[in-house]
Amino acid sequence: MMIIIFIELCRIADSLLWIPKSSRRTSSTFYIPNIIALLKMESQQLSQNSPTLQKDILLKKSTKRNQQLRIIIFLFLPSSSYFAILHPVASLRCSRLFLCLHSLILYLEHQQIHGRVV
């Protein structure tokens, strides 16, 4: 399930770049290993350097899937530098990606409140 989320995050990020596909160097699937490596590296640093911040994120009332999405958003967007690794102009679109991901979490929580399987 998490691989699907990573692929979708790449597609969302790629679509927010507004760069014609012919001028792109690589496809968005090329970035998936980079994203996974960044998330692993940042999750280790988060657990070592800021246990209270990690605790605050994990203690929110939500499903395990939503907790994972929240952690991904936190790790993905603490600054534009992580996102800029994916593409030089990507940092300009960070706020739009954050809004997109935040909307996804709200949708999942709404579906869960109403008893729908997500």
Curated annotation (Swiss-Prot):
A GO CC annotation given for this chain: membrane
Source domain of life: Eukaryota
Location relative to the cell: Membrane
Membrane protein topology class: Single-pass membrane protein
Major subcellular site: membrane
Key words of the record: Membrane, Transmembrane, Transmembrane helix
Protein name: Putative uncharacterized protein YHR145C
Annotated organism of origin: Saccharomyces cerevisiae (strain ATCC 204508 / S288c) (Baker's yeast)
Residue ranges crossing the lipid bilayer per the database entry: 71-91
Membrane keyword on record: yes
